[in-house]
Amino acid sequence: MGKTYVAKRLAYSMMGVKDVERVMMIQFHQSYSYEDFIMGFRPSATGFELKKGAFYNFCKKAEVDSDNEYFFIIDEINRGNLSKIFGELFMLIENDKRGNALQLLYSDEKFAVPKNVYIIGMMNTADRSLAMLDYALRRRFAFFDIKPGFETPGFREYRMALDNEKFNKLISCVESLNREISIDESLGEGFCIGHSYFCNLQPDTIDDSWLYGVVEYELIPLLKEYWFDEPMKVKDWSENLRSTIK
């Protein structure tokens, strides 16, 4: 299960019910803007028209249903230019500023973030091409690391249900590999290989072809990227992974 699954489950858990109408998920990217998030002028048949953005509309929806909690999930939050996307909302998302209205950039309207709106941001710390979160935004969030779940009771039961010797050897090797990654000064725990590579399998779908594919086309290429300047380390660990599925 990946971080998206966890974020939605967290929202439903806090709600106490699975209500998809009170959860919205978007994904930030380099082209995502304040105009997409809050509001901005967009081309129309007659020129330009002021369009409301995803977060603006979500907040308005939550505002008229103040007795219920609403969850706005942002995937890949560190892929966007956060200062430009959030704009004046940097202040409005703080706990003690909720409900306080502020005039928006493109409108005379006063806008406030309702107290019943919760923001869940997800980020991949292993992507070297991405900047870390702006400190001004960072202090407005609580942080929680999602670690590989190989040792969880659920994954152990999953392994037992699959009952595949080669799969078990591969997982044990990946756990050893993760210990190596976590103590590597150029990598660290944020680069550990997650359990999502190995999920959603059934006893009749896990075979030598699948095992070969995940090792050769997913795990080994990842190691080549991690240790691009240490080919011998890549070679050694590649051989270790391959040996588990022979």
Model-derived segments and their meaning:
Residues 197-199:
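Helical subdomain adjoining the active site within ATP-dependent kinase catalytic cores
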Residues 1-187, 202-217, 221, 225-246:
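AAA+ P-loop NTPase catalytic core and its hallmark functional loops
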